[in-house]
């Protein structure tokens, strides 16, 4: 959000002037030297907070003791002020690295020695790879480039990424930024990407500081007159525990993330950035966050000025800080916190607690060590390297999903398909491929450019832009299809259709796109391949059922190398192995389900959400994706058929014996003592192509009286495996009763149902009898 927009939100002439002054200070200080405690500075080199060999918590307290109240307050906001008398420069906390270094936030700038950075596929596309090691490796590369740019003075070290909200509704404009609809996938993605970004340095040190956002139940931007600034998400404890909060908990527990961002919306009547239970009690208390909590930009201003949650701005400042907020993206706390102290709404100690969390992260990053630290050797030569570009291409290969391939029409042959018509509004795009929250890419390969490496191309856009408001270009597109040996239609969406602040109203292709596909398919003398670029699902039932459309590919937003990856898959240089990370619903789904309804489970005429709870027809299901080869599954070893759950005490046993739900609370069990049940899944490649395959393990719980359970099945594990043609690979998944077989009851408590649990691995089914050990 720009400084101008921030000023508009405050709504007071005096404050507007202050805001612009703060913005001017930010703009002049953002490229100051990015570390304090320069050993050449005789004023600071002897200060205790500058001694890298002193424990960080001691250094933080020493620095806090030297700051005035006003200096502390000016460091509660993203454009933190300099403290020249202590040799501390200003710092911009807000940088973005969703799928590469971005210049969306003010913390990173491109130009000079750093004209761009590697732009990987949008997250929804990378998620479709279901490859945890790939996710972590992308994070590692992004952090290399971040450190290089930091060393060059054009970027910071605090990145407000990843976005791990659940893709609850297919219309959400920001669904493209997320790992999809499944909370376990989002949780694994969150932990993997955060580990890649932050590194694994000894001594609790950080390479860069990641931030998981937007906590919590945020997945509506602007729909049917309801926007994120005014939306109150009414969410049950059950849905919070088993859906919305799962990725954030994993971010903190498994990923050890350095920051969590609270969201604009309210949850059950409270702004998330002023909710002590969500912030102080849950993130910092239960989950033990080792880091800071930051607001989404201007969230504190939003809950005062737009949600009218408090009577005065000083009360808003106090409520947010006392709830556990440490840093405000925006000027609000810099302006109103001192007044809150004077009115007795806050103490200086409250401010110290918040500031200690941000200073600790900066010290873990080495920003007070007086030098650039262990990554000082990284520079311009380490950005956009050949290896990084290759990883961007490989990520696109792994994430692109083959949805239809009638009569094995793909791959095309360069010998037989020498002329290819390349048609559609997305056929020669570049920036569209990198989605939102992107930076300046190293270089682009559009679909047209990629296909041109394999065949002579006849190019026609067909319509002007994805809105496709007219059919004037259809005739030329049909003529090209008649002449070519094969036709590739590159259709779909872009940021004008789905984006932050822009939710969709329907799921169909925009404008005349469907008509263009149908007419070109009728005219084409060769096979027709439909390629879709989008973040959210599209109802393409017409193409799925049209025999003249031989193949359908979903490319998501495939990144800077997207065109090369699409072409490689079409011509068989790469074998598609992606799987859909979200359900593709039919158009009539949106007529039944308002975006404002947060309930996950089906009830009455309400069909539920995501594959876990939705009961209805789909265009393509979650986890669907074809390959040029075929795979079969078998169980290499006979798994256990029974698991016994031991109880932690006699009272718990009595509870279970008298329970009508036939389940045990996870909190009443000895989870650490349970034997894990290994599943050895043998994956055989029975086709002619080498390929990658995702092994999904779903659990279907017994129906045994747990009220409001309503789950069809839930993913408990997934593994990516590469198998050569004619070969086999064995994948081991260890099933943990507490972790994998538990469900959440209507009160938000995790329970293990007793009875027969069904595990689904492809076409395989295995039943486990779970019973109490009394």
From Swiss-Prot:
Stimuli inducing this protein: By sugar starvation.
One of the protein's GO biological processes: seed coat development
Record: active site: 296
Enzyme Commission number: 3.2.1.-, 3.2.1.55
UniProt note: phenotype after gene disruption: Delayed seeds germination resulting from an altered mucilage composition. No visible growth defects; probably due to partial redundancy with BXL2. Bxl1 and bxl2 double mutants have shortened siliques and curled leaf edges.
Signal peptide: 1-30
Tissue expression as described in the entry: Expressed in leaves, stems, seedlings, roots, inflorescences, siliques and developing seeds. Expressed in the vasculature of the roots, leaves, flowers and silique. Expressed in tissues undergoing secondary cell wall thickening such as protoxylem, metaxylem, intrafascicular cambium and fibers.
Protein keywords: Extracellular matrix, Glycoprotein, Glycosidase, Hydrolase, Secreted, Signal
Temperature dependence: Optimum temperature is 55 degrees Celsius.
GO terms for MF: alpha-L-arabinofuranosidase activity; xylan 1,4-beta-xylosidase activity
Note: Might be processed at the C-terminus.
Protein family membership: Belongs to the glycosyl hydrolase 3 family.
Function: Involved in pectic arabinan modification in mucilage secretory cells. Also acts as a beta-D-xylosidase during the remodeling of xylans in vascular development.
UniProt-recorded name of the protein: Beta-D-xylosidase 1
Organism: Arabidopsis thaliana (Mouse-ear cress)
Lineage: Eukaryota, Viridiplantae, Streptophyta, Embryophyta, Tracheophyta
